[in-house]
Amino acid sequence: EYKGVRILGLGGCMQYIPGAENQYTERDMHARIRKLRWKLWRKKGFDILVTHAPAKGVNDMEDLPHQGFQAFCDLIKKYVPAYFIHGHVHANYGSSFKRKDTYGSTRVINAYEFYVIDYPPEE
């Protein structure tokens, strides 16, 4: 939490080299999130979700290293944060790069290199 803004951060990407550091299976990521249940309940959720990898189907790519996590979609659906900020998918990876998107009412930002947001979000 920073100045009353509840921020949840989750590092790592989809596992594409077994045993590599900071790479997780979908099941692993769900387990990491389950460990946060008590904190999320106590804080009544979060306002901003910051991750390294994208969410599945939201600014991700088809190749395994750049696929997103369904676990992040589930988190966003449950807690409806104002922002979901991720990286890992770079602008030079192709024409499918999207800097901004939405998932439900959550604003999605690909923070490749850097990105500045206003909080609370301007309408």
Summary of predicted features, one role per range:
Residues 13-14, 54-56, 88-92, 113-114:
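Catalytic metal-binding/acid-base residues of hydrolase active sites
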